UniProtKB/Swiss-Prot annotation:
Keywords: Chloroplast, Heme, Iron, Membrane, Metal-binding, Monooxygenase, Oxidoreductase, Plastid, Plastid outer membrane, Transmembrane, Transmembrane helix. This is Ent-kaurene oxidase. Residues 1-10 are chloroplast intermembrane. It is a single-pass membrane protein. SUPFAM superfamilies: Cytochrome P450 (SSF48264). It comes from Salvia miltiorrhiza (Chinese sage).
Length: 519
């Protein structure tokens, strides 16, 4: 009987509860709409200007040339420093001046601290398992602390100086050897510099520069050049690959097999090589041979808090970051100096005044303001990362006098910031003097925003500046540089980056080496 009564009570309860639930739902709906309306009324900030686009696809066709930083900069001349575009189903807010970029990176950071990654970057970063692409959370704080403590912080940089000195000496020796053997032939700057940077990154990350390694998962032995391709070149190319589903999330269920297979294969090969390198070094550690490197630090200090996959990814990040961004800045700086004998000679005079007949070293860098200005000006004109990886607005905020809605993407156009005619006089010109004789302070490392700002400032900024400056200084001190035939017009860049599309080709001539003594 009780059971029957209970069964009879069900429809009665439903009959009473249905309207109650409906009324409650309607009430909550109106309350939510009222709160939204009040927020809009209380805000005196309008939405950003919109760049006109097409239905459904928005502004995608206007970005098809794959150099969005330049398109963004052109649009800023018409729509202002902050505006809104549509990339398919997504709303993107583009920031084009230092003021609004700093506001986003520092003042309003708490509202936009989440990274918005493409499908390719999600796979290649193992779902944000590296410092540069993670959200601002406990993993980010711990991982960055380990990176600074072991590798990139000031104290760690002093410990790794021996590796940098060896790298710079090797670079100079190779260029000098080429100049003596082939005095009239252009040298491929990137080939030499890139190889030595990769060696440095390997020493700092895993303890040694590996010439070859057997990779069990691939059942093959890889050369150093093959490792470089798998660990650096392929991921860099994959990171800028576009999956059309990124622009239409509601269609992500549709397969894109060619894209997925390509990126997953890069991911598999990268992991296979990193596992082989780590296992090789674990055997070295087990034998009792300790080396001051990132791997040894992570295994001794973070093995209990980080997974094996996270450790693998952090080590890979240290390799690819050191191998790539410093190269971009240094190659462009040498391009600019090679086509400008007057400024090259001015730098040489500064080095000679500071060092006399001694070889330039890191202690002397603080006495070379023009060299620092060359580094800063190259960062400004040829920023290694022209657009900061997208961020996600997880709560409504205000930027630059506009209301930024929740759910928007934020794109900080570093290239546009550094081409702002309201801040920089003749920004299209490479003119280091603007950082020496003007109001700009050459000690302000983040003036050009190339290394970000606030809590997400680039951990490798100090190392990048040190390596690039000492390399530029030593190369100018020991060699005379001029561009090869047709090289001055060779300024095309690779895809979404500011990488020089074709490696720098220069004619070099040794200076009076007997006047440069090793100190």
């Amino acid at each position: 009987m009780d059971t029957l009564l209970s069964l009879q009570a069900v429809p009665a309860a439903a009959a009473i509860g249905g309207p109650v639930v409906a009324i409650g739902g309607i009430t909550l709906f109106f309350i939510r709409e009222y709160v939204k309306d009040q927020r809009k009324k209380s805000s005196s900030f309008p939405p950003p200007p919109k760049v006109p686009g097409l239905p459904v696809i928005g502004n995608l066709l206007q970005l098809k040339e794959k150099k969005p930083h330049k398109t963004f900069t052109k649009w800023s001349e018409k729509y202002g420093p902050i505006y809104s575009i549509r990339t398919g189903a997504n709303t993107m807010i583009v920031l084009n001046t230092n003021d609004v970029a700093k506001e986003a990176m520092i003042t309003k950071y708490s509202s936009i601290s989440t990274r918005k990654l493409s499908k390719a970057l999600t796979i290649l970063t193992s779902d944000k398992s590296i410092v540069a692409m993670s959200d601002y959370n406990e993993f980010y704080k711990a991982a960055k602390r380990h990176l600074l403590t072991s590798t990139l912080g000031p104290t760690a940089q002093k410990r790794h100086r021996v590796h940098r000195n060896l790298m710079i000496n090797n670079i100079c020796d190779q260029f000098l050897a080429h100049a003596k053997m082939y005095p009239s032939e252009a040298v491929n700057f990137r080939k030499i510099f890139q190889s030595e940077l990769f060696g440095l990154s390997m020493k700092q990350a895993i303890g040694e520069d590996v010439e070859s390694i057997y990779v069990e998962d691939l059942d093959t032995t890889l050369s150093r050049q093959e490792m470089f391709k798998i660990l650096v070149v392929d991921p860099m190319e994959g990171a800028i690959d576009v999956d059309w589903r990124d622009f239409f999330p509601y269609l992500k269920w549709i397969p894109n097999q060619h894209f997925e297979n390509k990126i997953q294969q890069m991911h598999f090969h990268r992991e296979a090589v990193m596992k082989a390198l780590i296992e090789q070094q674990k055997k070295r550690i087990a034998s009792g041979k300790a080396i001051n490197c990132y791997l040894d630090h992570l295994l001794s200090e973070a093995a209990d808090t980080l997974s094996e996959q996270q450790i693998l990814m952090l080590l890979w990040e240290a390799i690819i970051e050191a191998s790539d961004t410093t190269l971009v800045t240094t190659e462009w700086a040498m391009y600019e100096l090679s086509k400008d004998p007057k400024r090259q000679n001015y730098l040489l005079s500064e080095i000679q005044n500071a060092c006399g007949f001694d070889q330039l070293n890191e202690e002397k860098l603080c006495r070379l303001p023009y060299l620092a200005a060359i580094f800063q000006e190259t960062l400004r004109k040829h920023s290694p990362v022209p657009v900061v990886p997208l961020r996600y607005v997880h709560e409504e905020t205000q930027l630059g006098g506009y209301t930024i809605p929740e759910g928007s993407e934020i794109a900080i156009n570093i290239y546009g910031c550094n081409m702002d005619k309201n801040v920089w006089d003749s920004p299209e010109e490479w003119r280091p003097e603007r950082f020496v004789f003007g109001k700009d302070d050459t000690t302000e490392l983040h003036k050009t925003m190339a290394f970000g700002g606030g809590k997400r400032v680039c951990a490798g900024a100090l190392q990048a500046m040190t390596i690039s400056c000492i390399a530029i200084g030593r190369l100018v001190q020991e060699l005379e540089w001029r561009l090869g035939d047709g090289e001055e017009a060779n300024v095309d860049t690779l895809g979404l980056t500011t990488h020089k599309l074709h490696p720098l080709q220069t004619i070099i001539k040794p200076r009076l080496r007997d006047r440069v003594c090793v100190s």
